[in-house]
Amino acid sequence: MSIVTTGPDTGYYVDVFRSRKERGGDKMHDYFYHNLGQSMTLTAADGTDLNLQPTEELAFAGAHLYAYSYLYDKKMVATNKDVKATFTIDMKDKGGDDIYMNLWMKGEPEREVFTALAPMTEGLSRTPGMPYNIKEQPTLTFVARQHGEAWNRPFVSVYEPSTKKEPSAIESVSYFDVEETALNDFAGICVKSKNGRI
């Protein structure tokens, strides 16, 4: 994880997560992220609907991983599109300045993306001054699954927190590859700010 500062009050995080089995034979690799909030959206990066559908994946029923059996209200789509997730903390009872976490992720062939709900975040439920009753709210969850290896097709993400009063400074996130085949582990990211800075 890297922090990129673009101004006195603006910046974002970059995460490039690679995963593979040392001896090959990779079935799949998962990228798991959850965030506070009462609502979450997951769309293509251009804002179009991904048409997520209910799924039984991410559970013991899928014979993949016991730890995912606590997830519920799971939805999934197979897509190679770049995606954007937005987690929202509704602050209507605290002055109306909603808080967002914006996540952009590069698409890849043989990838699936999921939304799900997880049990509430116990540790934070005891923190005073939280903007909503965390004990009554499940934890919003995003999962990306890469079939095969995820070393040359890593999970490439950009995260930016924002609020209603201090909106996102990012206009778009795009990705590029290099033509040099020896650099097959290269991850190129182009973040365009609303002020024109790239």
Regions found by a protein language model. Give the residues of each.
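CBM-like, beta-strand-rich accessory domains located in the C-terminal region of large
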Residues: M1-I198
